[in-house]
Curated annotation (Swiss-Prot):
Full protein name: 2,4-didehydro-3-deoxy-L-rhamnonate hydrolase
InterPro entries: FAH (IPR051121), Fumarylacetoacetase-like_C (IPR011234), Fumarylacetoacetase_C_sf (IPR036663)
Keywords (A to Z) from UniProt: Hydrolase, Magnesium, Metal-binding, Rhamnose metabolism
Gene: LRA6
Effect ascribed to mutating residue 81 to A: Strong decrease in hydrolase activity
SUPFAM superfamilies per record: FAH (SSF56529)
Main function: Hydrolase that catalyzes the hydrolysis of 2,4-didehydro-3-deoxy-L-rhamnonate to pyruvate and L-lactate. In vitro can also use acylpyruvates such as acetylpyruvate and trimethylacetopyruvate. Catalyzes the fifth (last) step in an alternative pathway for rhamnose utilization that does not involve phosphorylated intermediates.
Top-rank taxon: Bacteria
């Protein structure tokens, strides 16, 4: 099943995608699309739900994400293009919750940004508490999978100390969605094609089968150090083709650029890049 949240920022409603690819309004079944509400949402008679007209905005497809755990350098070719050693165990960092963004909302570069970059990634939404979970049971703890763009500011990430979160956690830097897709519909998470274009030019092409550490290994590993709760989001690394790795010269995002990305079975995203402005108290997600 494919679940979503649709509507203006801060006013999203829960939805489900029907057999024709249309949004059906779930708000008469559940008040919000949280992990706790998924069981009731799955039991809905989809054909009887109100059809949502037009093309509403998609928000982050699940409400109540508690934390964003990210895995770096999880594709061998990406580690090589980044001039970094291939990890012998997963490299973990965190993205700020304030970086959450709708899948087609604008990405706002931070003030004085010069090294904005893109990363198409498979996201994993946790459905049950994970604490010292074995690899064998790890996938049973997954509520669903999502498409994520792990937008980055490489100068802040790498040139101003060693805390990657400084370059990964800027506002709008974690577009998620359009859908939360249940594991039964995705099948094997280690065989999903993925791509990303910038201004119509293909930049990244890959498949999750080339991950260094697979999804089950990552959930098990992370759960040894950080308890994962229902609704937590783990993003699993990106294939080669990021801007900083382009030859003979790196390519970085600028205002007006358009990123378009997708993962097989998980849908597509489109974001226009904007220059920095004060975002005030805008609600993200």
């Amino acid at each position: 099943m494919k679940f979503c949240r649709f509507g203006q920022r801060g006013q999203e409603k829960p939805g489900i995608i029907d057999a024709d690819g249309k949004i059906r309004d779930l708000s008469g079944v559940v008040p919000e699309l949280t992990i706790e509400a998924l069981a009731a949402a799955k039991g809905a008679d989809v054909a009887s739900l109100p059809l949502v007209e037009g093309e509403p905005r998609y928000g982050v497809p699940v409400k109540g994400i508690g934390k964003i755990v990210a895995i770096g350098l999880n594709y061998e070719d990406h580690a090589i293009e980044s001039n970094l050693p291939i990890p012998t165990e997963p490299m973990m960092f965190m993205k700020a919750l304030s970086s959450l963004n709708g899948p087609n909302d604008e990405v706002v570069l931070p003030k004085n940004s010069t090294h904005g970059d893109w990363e198409v990634e498979l996201g994993v939404v946790i459905g049950e508490t994970c604490r010292f979970v074995s690899e064998d049971e790890a996938l049973s703890k997954v509520a669903g999978y999502v498409l994520v763009n792990d937008v980055s500011e490489r100068f802040n990430q790498k040139q101003r100390g060693t805390q990657w979160s400084k370059g990964k956690g800027h506002d709008t830097f974690c577009p998620v969605g359009p859908w939360l897709v249940t594991p039964d519909e995705v099948g094997d998470p280690q065989d999903l094609d993925m791509h990303l274009n910038v201004n119509g030019t293909r930049m990244q092409t890959g498949n999750t089968k080339t991950m260094i550490f697979n999804v089950a290994q990552l959930i098990s590993y992370v759960s040894e150090y950080i308890t994962l709760y229902p609704g937590d989001l783990m993003i699993t690394g990106t294939p080669p083709g990021v801007g900083e790795g382009k030859k003979p010269q790196a390519i970085y995002l600028k205002a007006g650029d358009v990123m378009e990305l997708g993962i097989e079975k998980l849908g597509t995203q489109r974001q226009q890049v904007s220059e920095w402005r004060h975002l005030g108290d805008e609600v993200f997600g």
